[in-house]
Amino acid sequence: MDIKQYMKEVGQRARKASRAMAKADTAAKNQALLFIAAAIRREADALRAANQLDLEAARAGGLAPALLDRLTLSDKAIATMAEGLEQIVALPDPIGEISNMKYRPTGIQVGQMRVPLGVIGIIYEARPNVTVDAAGLCIKSGNATILRGGSEAIHCNQALAKLVNEGLAAAGLPADAVQIVETTDRAAVGELITMPQYVDVIVPRGGKGLIERLMREATVPMIKHLDGICHVYIDDKADLKKALDICFNAKCHRYGTCNTMETLLVARSVAATVLPELAKLYATKEVELRGDDEARAILQGYPHLASATEEDWSTEYLAAILSVKIVGSLDEAIDHINTYSSQHTDAIVTEDYTRAMRFLREVDSASVMINASTRFADGFEYGLGAEIGISNDKLHARGPVGLDGLTSLKYVVFGHGEVRA
């Protein structure tokens, strides 16, 4: 296969489809999403069978446990994909919305209209759910998309893409509005990220190695996050039960996600009370605790205890490992977070309103939480219907990227024959 020519043809079809999608009406887009959701439920057995082929190959190839977890398409995951599409249907269509209208002294009226970005290239690894989430959001926001999933999920991605294409066609929309890259050749990624004439933005969802490569090589703008180094700070005004529940969930709910807590900060005055209780919970999951000197002194006897190094504070483990640091004040906690955080998601546990609001204002992250698990940093949980990714950049989109993040604004001007003096 001539990869360059193949990707050029994919890009040309996507660009053509994007023009049709930009003017598609809300009813047709919603109808397509409902067709796809129904097909996912109807074809659940076929999807599980395709996923099983991927899982068998992945296990034989020694795929890491965290990636196997992401690759697995459970009954719950299938149901969640369909529900996510139905949530997107229920959301208002942002396309064509005009806002910020104002009259100018010259007599013209100026406002902004929300429009699609155009063609969105999405690169992801062993996450078949992204195929549906991304397709749904792109359809509703009037964009075309080119999906390049990881080779580990090729069978499942192809099965899902077929259902998406059929749903689009049934609703009278171009099937090429959602295309999956059929080859697992990595050269296809290199072509996709260097086709600005066909692709308007790239959304990568993958490991650090993938993101770093794209940052070096891409000539198409990106919406991305590099790491998910998330913190929870237990303040000395925290409710103990809330702290235990939140910190156990934030670490142990799922290890392989970017919104999992990787560093726990504890106020010195409550550390001797809260850490032993947390250790009992973490021991049930055999979580390795990498503590500073003070934390290790409190945690003596914990069966999975190690010393934290400077590198640990800036490491995304994606595993049953947690770094633990004792801090003397809220100022020290905020300073540590702003120094080592990846600006993804950080949380405080406290009953002190003033401290909580300071934390919200001063922590420079895409999501900042009070008395809630970092695991809530997710488009589905935020009511976005689904998310196409999470951005910890500051330009265009920040945090979970839903419908609005896949649109742009253009200025619109209404006049009555005015000319500029």
From Swiss-Prot:
Domain of life assignment: Bacteria
Subcellular location as annotated: Cytoplasm
Family matches, as PROSITE patterns: PROA
Disulfide bonds: none
Cytoplasm in keyword set: yes
E.C. code: 1.2.1.41
Primary location recorded for the protein, binned into one broad class: cytoplasm
GO biological process: L-proline biosynthetic process
Family statement drawn from the similarity comment of this UniProt entry: Belongs to the gamma-glutamyl phosphate reductase family.
Organism: Janthinobacterium sp. (strain Marseille) (Minibacterium massiliensis)
Alphabetized CDD domains for the sequence: ALDH_F18-19_ProA-GPR
Name of the featured protein: Gamma-glutamyl phosphate reductase
TM annotation in the entry: none
Pathway the protein contributes to: Amino-acid biosynthesis; L-proline biosynthesis; L-glutamate 5-semialdehyde from L-glutamate: step 2/2
Gene3D superfamilies: Aldehyde Dehydrogenase, Chain A, domain 1, Aldehyde Dehydrogenase, Chain A, domain 2
Class of this enzyme: oxidoreductase
Alphabetized PANTHER family for the sequence: DELTA-1-PYRROLINE-5-CARBOXYLATE SYNTHASE, GLUTAMATE SEMIALDEHYDE DEHYDROGENASE
The keyword Amino-acid biosynthesis appears for this protein: yes
GO molecular function, one term: NADP binding
Catalytic reaction equation(s): L-glutamate 5-semialdehyde + phosphate + NADP(+) = L-glutamyl 5-phosphate + NADPH + H(+)
Chain's role: Catalyzes the NADPH-dependent reduction of L-glutamate 5-phosphate into L-glutamate 5-semialdehyde and phosphate. The product spontaneously undergoes cyclization to form 1-pyrroline-5-carboxylate.
